[in-house]
């Protein structure tokens, strides 16, 4: 792929990397490193889109390529934005809050065209319904260490799959990148 037409994923997430690769897209990876704190009063979707945009633009300033994809996934339950848990106790708290109630998984993504200095930003929302969880289920899952680098303290594609009754919306969005939407937007922008 010519230097001036490369796609760069601005993320260290192995799940995003796997999803994008599964679509047969050639891309490079250049992890972004930006603060991930909401602005007081910021709506959850706006927060995730802002982070995605910041990741894409910051990565473009530090690396070669043409199109830069930034993404950020959050879980929202009863108005609380849940990012990655701080520790095991925080993971237990999050999973107890999600137990038996619907919540939203929001992935904001941004595709930045460095050559044209243009950006496309969107948020995709998927509703997830957890079954009621027993304390011992939560404790055993947290003990695996799996929840520690996941928004909302769970990975739908892993051991938490048995906690989910159903979803309304994009499965890949819950994993970390709404693949259908991202691929379509890459096509629209001329990257594919």
UniProtKB/Swiss-Prot annotation:
The record marks 15, 73, 157 as: Important for substrate specificity. One of its GO terms (molecular function) is UTP diphosphatase activity. GO terms for cellular component: cytoplasm. Its cofactor is a divalent metal cation. The active site is at 72 (proton acceptor). Its main location: cytoplasm. Its EC number is 3.6.1.9. It comes from the Bacteria. It catalyses: dTTP + H2O = dTMP + diphosphate + H(+); UTP + H2O = UMP + diphosphate + H(+). It is found in: Cytoplasm. One of its GO terms (biological process) is nucleotide metabolic process. Nucleoside triphosphate pyrophosphatase that hydrolyzes dTTP and UTP. May have a dual role in cell division arrest and in preventing the incorporation of modified nucleotides into cellular nucleic acids. Belongs to the Maf family. YhdE subfamily. This is dTTP/UTP pyrophosphatase. It comes from Geobacter metallireducens (strain ATCC 53774 / DSM 7210 / GS-15). The lineage of its organism: Bacteria, Pseudomonadati, Thermodesulfobacteriota, Desulfuromonadia, Geobacterales.
